[in-house]
Amino acid sequence: SVGLSVTELLEIYRYHEPQISLPSESAALLLHLRRKNIRLGIISDGRSRTQRNKLRALGLDWIEDVVISEEFGSEKPCEANYLYFEKKYPDYRFTYIADNLKKDFVAPNRLGWRTVCLKDDGRNIHSQNIEIAEVQKPQFIIDKLTDLIKVEEKRL
């Protein structure tokens, strides 16, 4: 026993400053996209403070359009989270990258977005070894974020 209640332990977990970082090639790709004025956004489930702490730790707090379920009032796969981007950027095409096969791809598939699953490298909390319905399947699966370049070449 550590002498803390479950509530206290949850508070520590939810509000700690995580010690995480992006792989260097992922950070370089995002910087490259930013320099090319390609709009990036984030859709994330979870508590606002927890998710914002993660974004800050990853150096992604520069991304303007962030939809966090606690702030937005709906969770994936609710289409409202995705429609935020369609309403704000009506003339854009969207590519959605995620890793949770159970819920991440349902709404963007229905909306006609390009969907890409970042394959689990063994550290993901969401199992990718599951049976899923067709609507849950991404159109593409990549091993690392830099493989996104190959996916986008297929769009042209």
Predicted regions and their residues:
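Conserved phosphate-coupling serine/threonine residues in phosphotransfer and NTP-handling enzymes
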Residues: 44
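Asp-based, Mg2+/Mn2+-dependent phosphohydrolase catalytic module
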Residues: 4-7, 27, 31-34, 48-156
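Short, acidic loop-to-helix structural element flanking the phosphoryl-transfer center
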Residues: 10-41, 79
